[in-house]
Swiss-Prot record:
<dbReference type="GO" id="GO:0016491">
    <property type="term" value="F:oxidoreductase activity"/>
</dbReference>
<feature type="transmembrane region" description="Helical">
    <location>
        <begin position="2"/>
        <end position="22"/>
    </location>
</feature>
<protein>
    <recommendedName>
        <fullName>Uncharacterized protein Mb2261</fullName>
    </recommendedName>
</protein>
<dbReference type="InterPro" id="IPR018713">
    <property type="entry name" value="MPAB/Lcp_cat_dom"/>
</dbReference>
<dbReference type="Pfam" id="PF09995">
    <property type="entry name" value="MPAB_Lcp_cat"/>
</dbReference>
<feature type="transmembrane region" description="Helical">
    <location>
        <begin position="168"/>
        <end position="188"/>
    </location>
</feature>
<keyword id="KW-1133">Transmembrane helix</keyword>
<keyword id="KW-0472">Membrane</keyword>
<dbReference type="GO" id="GO:0005886">
    <property type="term" value="C:plasma membrane"/>
</dbReference>
<keyword id="KW-1003">Cell membrane</keyword>
<keyword id="KW-0812">Transmembrane</keyword>
Amino acid sequence: MLLPAANVIMQLAVPGVGYGVLESPVDSGNVYKHPFKRARTTGTYLAVATIGTESDRALIRGAVDVAHRQVRSTASSPVSYNAFDPKLQLWVAACLYRYFVDQHEFLYGPLEDATADAVYQDAKRLGTTLQVPEGMWPPDRVAFDEYWKRSLDGLQIDAPVREHLRGVASVAFLPWPLRAVAGPFNLFATTGFLAPEFRAMMQLEWSQAQQRRFEWLLSVLRLADRLIPHRAWIFVYQLYLWDMRFRARHGRRIV
């Protein structure tokens, strides 16, 4: 939950996404009610978008669309939103792209240009798997950086969304013993992974002493990453694909 929680904060910093999640009537996607199911759904989507086939993407799109049809603002909502809005989906996809890039950059620094360009072009599927038209995805990394900077001006985390996200960062949805042990550490790590502008919106303080501890944490994660074979990460995504295909064949819900 370390880097993923930080990325969720980034996604929900757009008010339409934040309130869409907060007010969603789809209980099966509520992290506080079904945390492990929520994690499985997210993992499945990332696996399908990155290594899945066109058939896999059609399956996940159909399943997600069923849930998204119920997620739209009402007369009492603080902001107007619709889960099918490609602009909102583009922002979420952009954050997911940053999730993959951040994993590398926090541990090893920037990717080489050729690799970064290839990763970026593949990342468009994070949006086009749903309702983001291919032409809406910024054509290159320079255009993406411009889109990102423009988008920062429209970000805002209101108090209700902030409370929800702080609970996500401190794993408030876990049973008490796990929550008590993992919560403070996960909140610390999540704060470290956030850029300063997101920390400010979350009203999270960060000191030089905390940064030094965070750098130590990164060194531990760097060592762990070097010890775990790359194939192990691919295998985890493959498991998500196998699980989704099994569920589809047997008429069980995918998300």
